[in-house]
Structure formats: structure tokens, C-alpha cells
Amino acid sequence: MTPGELRRLYFIIHTFLSYGLDELIPKIRLTLPLRIWRRMLFWMPNRHQDQPLGTRLRLALQELGPVWIKFGQMLSTRRDLFPPHIADQLALLQDRVAPFEGKLAQQQIEKAMGGLPVDAWFDDFSVEPLASASIAQVHTARLKENGKEVVIKVIRPDILPIIKADMKLIYRLARWVPRLLPDGRRLRPQEVVREYEKTLLDELNLLRESANAIQLRRNFEDSPMLYVPEVYPDYCSESMMVMERIYGIPVSDVEALEAQGTNMQLLAERGVQVFFTQVFRDSFFHADMHPGNIFVSYEHPEDPQYIGIDCGIVGSLNKEDKRYLAENFIAFFNRDYRKVAELHVDSGWVPPDTNVEEFEFAIRTVCEPIFEKPLAEISFGHVLLNLFNTARRFNMEVQPQLVLLQKTLLYVEGVGRQLYPQLDLWKTAKPFLESWIKDQVGIPALVRAFKDKAPFWIERMPEIPELVYQSLQQSKQLQTSVDTIVRDMHVRHVRQGQSRYLFGIGAVLLLSGTLLFIHRPEWGMMPGWLMAGGVVTWLIGWRKTH
């Protein structure tokens, strides 16, 4: 490690200890050398003894800076790893940092523009940022070509070396987790860190975010439920993104929404519909739908429309995952735990040799108490969490796409019930799920599949005779190969039988010659000839096997 890395590591451990986070490590794991080392190098009393553990962890991550803040935010979605009191505190982490100098942002923009001055493309460029976060900040301007109001998102200068340095240290700490925590191996800390690193590096590429926003906008074009601002791809690069400026009420500002007469029930239900439409119709969902990224249009409060921004993190499910997920939800709310267990096995989420009866019993034990509440109060997100936690005990592998989905579902639920506490998520989602499943089976699905595949088969039809001929030829060649292999195996089997026979004769001759040589020396050369014959017979047998 370099001196700089050592200083940073010292600061990280010093910060953790100053917040008393060493109590996360069981005393039995703190061996005497570790305790002495801790006292000598990192002595620091817990300065926040009056605060609960979750709060202290949140404050420590905030003190360590943006990379750790975002890491904590990601960990808050992994409720399979942490108890609720810690996960809830991590969810409060705010990705707000001091903005960097506007002139420096202007230089970054001009660099992304190939050295052109800002006023070559933009008018009314604001040096003061509109918003600032750990990865990027946003400035307002107008497009010179058409006068439209836009926002320019620009990556922080020199953020990549900072991320790489801190990620290296996070990896080092992750390697210690299995040694320090009794359940550390099950938590798969290095896998969690790899997942975070990928998400973080994806956010550094604004071309990826631009493409995500364009796709989401296309999926909801002319939709009354969701509006996605227009992206101007000709102005975008890896370090800069230009998109339409929007005006709306933050979805968390319930007072402002009520003041303008927003239909809160419809708004909450539309949030659920938007989510399930993204997941099941489009297989492409916005996976960072926290309140800071969602606004509500000022127009038509009686028929409210969401506005979604910041598409840096998206998720997708394949057809099989969607089907299993929809059937899992329906089976769960029908309290058909056997079906839930079978679906987990059939999907490959748990190993195929899982004992279905034991798995069903475990699911029933964990999930049945949930139905003590009315259906309207049951949380979809916590249903998924309970299912995944139970499945993890049966060696369920981490499914990154399902983790993203669960996180997004928790956001959607939280926002929906904040807007309209009586929101019945199941009542809103059930018709959608049942309709989607019905659409995937039967005659309509068959006709749609035929339509989708028809161009492919029409294009390949002239090749069919040749493909049939090639298949027949390959079949003949395969049969010839099989016959040859069978013949070779038969010959080898015969030779092995002969070899065993010769080895037996050789052994008898050697043994007989040896006994005669010892007990009948008067027989002269006969014992020697017998032993020589035995050796020759062994050699012939050995040659037949080779």
C-alpha cells in the first residue's frame, strides 16, 4: 500500500471507531493481538454513545465522503443483509455535497465540446449550479439553435481517481468481514462490493444514462402516467449530458401537491401502474426512483402525471424471471406456499436438489403471520424481502436484477403510501399481473409468437432443403463414428481380457519357478526357464494393453 492509501485507511478505521462501530464485531472475534493493535494505533472513545447503532453508522459514512455515502445508500436496499433499524438509517443518507466551482464546470463542458467555448452551443449559461451531487452537478442554459431551456449535467473533475482509491480500500475491508463477523461468509461482502463498483462506474458514463433516458421516454411516449424529459444526444458525451429542463413539484412535497388540488389517490395508483408497466410490459425499469428523482407536473392536477429524471441506474428482467415473479406474487397472496416453493426451484433461483417440503414449511412459517394484517397494509417489498431471506437459507444465489427490483418496489410503495395512506397496492397490481400472465399463454400468445418468428422462418425457408441434407450427412457421419467407437471398445475389451489371462499365466510361471528354485535345486535349469517364461508372458500381456 502507498503512504496515501495507508493514511486514508487509518482515517477510515479511526472514523469507524470514533462512532463505536467496533461493537458490530463480536468480542469473541477480537483476539488479544487485535485488541492491543486497536488500542495502540486507533485509540478513540465512542463520542456518540447516546445514539443508536444505525444512526452512528449513517453519520460515519457521511463523514467519510461521497463514495461511502453512495455505498451506504446501496446497502440500504440490501435488507437481506441488515436488520431494519440499520437499513432504515442507511436509507436516510443524502447524496448532497458542496458544488465545485462553476468556472471549473464550464471548463469541463468546453472540454466535452471539443475545446469550443460554451457560448458556441448555449446561451444564458448559469455558472451557479442548479443541483450538486457526489458524481455530477447540473447547470442551466438555453440551446443556441432553438432557444429551448436545458440542463447540462457534467461529471465532477478528477472523481475517477478518488473512486478507484476508495474502492480499493473497500475491497480490502470486505476481505476482513468473513473473519470478523460470524455470518460474514453468507453476506458475500466482496460480491456486494463488486455490484456497487459496477453501479458506480456505470453512473460515470453519461452516454449510458442518455441512452437509458431515451429508451424510457420512447416507452412512455404520449402516456398520461409518466413524462421523461427529452435528451439531446448530439450534445452528449461520456462526461456531459444535455436534456430538456422540466418544472414540477417534488413528489415528496405532499403539502404543495394538495394545495394545487392534485388527485392523490390517482397519483399513488399511477405510481404502481408505472412500475408494473416498466417491469412487465417493457422489461426495462428505472431503478433509482427515490423522491429526489420524481416530480409531478403542474398541469392537470385532477389527472396528474409523473416526471422522471436521472436514469443512471436501470434494471431489466428476462421473460422467465417476469413469469416466475408474477406467479410468485399471485401464489403468495393466494397463500399457496407449495406453489411459491416450486416456482423458486423451477426458476433456478434455488438449487434443483432443494427439499420442496422443507422449503414450503419455511416459507409458510415466515410469511403466514403477514396475513394477520389487512391486504391493503401488506407491503409488496417486504413480501419479496421475506421470500428472498427464506430462500437464501436454502442457498439462493444473489440475483442482482431482483435486488434492483425489490429496491425500486420499496421506493414506489413508500412514495405511494406517503401520497395516499389508504393505497391498496395488491388491489391495484393484481389485475395487471393476472392480465399479463393470461397474455403469455394460450392462443393469443401462440399467434403473437408466430408473428414475431414468421420473418425469421420466411428468411430461412430457402435454406431448409440444404439444412436437411446436411443433417442427414452429419447423422451418417455420427453413426460411422459411433460404429468405430463401439468396434474400438470391443477390441480394447478383448485385449484387456487377454492381458488379464496372460498376467495370470505369467504370475503362475514366476511363482512356480521361484518355488522350484528354492525347494528343488536338483531340477537344474527348469526353474530358470519357468521364471523367464513368466516374465515374457507378462511383457506380452503389458504390450496388448498398450
Curated annotation (Swiss-Prot):
GO biological-process terms attached to the record: regulation of ubiquinone biosynthetic process; ubiquinone biosynthetic process
Membrane topology: Multi-pass membrane protein
EC number: 2.7.-.-
Location (main, coarse): membrane
GO CC field: plasma membrane
Top EC class for this record: transferase
Membrane-spanning segments: 501-521, 522-542
Subcellular location: Cell inner membrane
Family matches, as InterPro entries: ABC1_dom, Kinase-like_dom_sf, UbiB, UbiB_bact, UbiB_kinase
Molecular function via GO: ATP binding; protein kinase activity
Pathway it works in: Cofactor biosynthesis; ubiquinone biosynthesis [regulation]
Entry keywords, A to Z: ATP-binding, Cell inner membrane, Cell membrane, Kinase, Membrane, Nucleotide-binding, Transferase, Transmembrane, Transmembrane helix, Ubiquinone biosynthesis
UniProt-annotated catalytic positions: D288
UniProt similarity note: Belongs to the ABC1 family. UbiB subfamily.
Name this protein carries in UniProt: Probable protein kinase UbiB
Species of provenance: Klebsiella pneumoniae (strain 342)
Gene: ubiB
